[in-house]
Amino acid sequence: MLASKLDPFFKRFEELNSLLSSSDILNDISKMTTLSKEQKNLEPIVLKAKEYLKTLDNIEENKALLNDPELGELAKEELKTLEELKPKLEEEIKILLLPKDPNDERNIFLEIRAGTGGDEASLFVGDLVKAYARYAENRGYKLEIVSSSEGSVGGFKEIIMLVKGTGAYSRLKYEGGTHRVQRVPQTESQGRVHTSAITVAVMPEVDDIEIEINPNDLKVDVMRSSGHGGQSVNTTDSAVRITHIPTGIVVVNQDGKSQHKNKESAMKVLKARLYEMQESERLAKESEARKSQVGSGDRSERIRTYNFPQNRISDHRINLTLYRLDAIMQDGLFDEIIEPLITHHQAQALQEQNL
């Protein structure tokens, strides 16, 4: 019974309240921060659980009044409302009880690269960047370009953006993978539909203490920044290329105005990539459980198709098709896809957890 599973959460919440009011904890900033975070995570469960248990009590009280000559009809109406509320609260609690993704509240690096399709792929990267920018604005996230390489006819061959905002990873993590686009290029005189592809990687921003990098493992090169078409954009060696020798990961940054700024940004991206690599290795060890979840975020996994002639967008992970591609791209309405993905993911997780 669900009610019996809630007792440990009440006990731990009360324990945390007591601990956070003790002088020993108040004098230990690190411990207080850790416990406060745990309390904050538990609070939604405790509040919803209290509402649920109160509903169960009210159901029993109204059942006892059904045969009352004066209050019977009123109790019957109230009971109907409560019986409808009960399963909704149970579902909400079950979702709250699911294991939390530790990265969900983090900022993210969004790395988008042109794949097959040449110039058309680069142009679509540019279109997707604009759509993501509108989505970020809709949700109150801040978006900044960390590094970019422009395409020869527009768009980007590659771009890395930092998306800042509470819960950015929890929603945009579903964007990781290969995105296929089908449309008639502007240069196509015969009106034929071309297919191209781009890849999206979603990497949580990590703290320095989470990823330690041995300076001896790095090869740092400085060079002159180059702009569109390769022309020099300044006369100082401000561009930075960092190679992580053990993994072969290379990060180039030239968008900042100073070498120091570019190196700082490149190091942040490198740490995010190393963290992503560690997470991928960890998840690979849990591959059986992973298979049942919505997408691995692997860049090689084709997750979505954008068909412009049909105004169609299809997410292949949950067989979702919407004929609203124009609105989704123009207004950044990705929640129309992300919300069903979250719902599907939660349903799979509930099944795995036997909740």
From Swiss-Prot:
Gene Ontology molecular function: translation release factor activity, codon specific
Biased composition, class Basic and acidic residues, residue ranges: 280-291
GO cellular component: cytoplasm
Entries under PROSITE patterns matching the protein: RF_PROK_I (PS00745)
Entry annotated with the keyword Cell membrane: no
SMART domains assigned: PCRF
Compartments reported by the entry: Cytoplasm
Annotated keywords: Cytoplasm, Methylation, Protein biosynthesis
Positions of region (Disordered): 280-303
PTM statement from Swiss-Prot or TrEMBL: Methylated by PrmC. Methylation increases the termination efficiency of RF1.
N5-methylglutamine, modified sites: 231
NCBIfam families xref list: prfA, PRK00591.1
Task performed by this protein: Peptide chain release factor 1 directs the termination of translation in response to the peptide chain termination codons UAG and UAA.
HAMAP family tied to this protein: Rel_fac_1
Family designation: Belongs to the prokaryotic/mitochondrial release factor family.
The protein, known as: Peptide chain release factor 1
Annotated source species: Campylobacter jejuni subsp. jejuni serotype O:2 (strain ATCC 700819 / NCTC 11168)
Phylogenetic placement of the source organism: Bacteria, Pseudomonadati, Campylobacterota, Epsilonproteobacteria, Campylobacterales
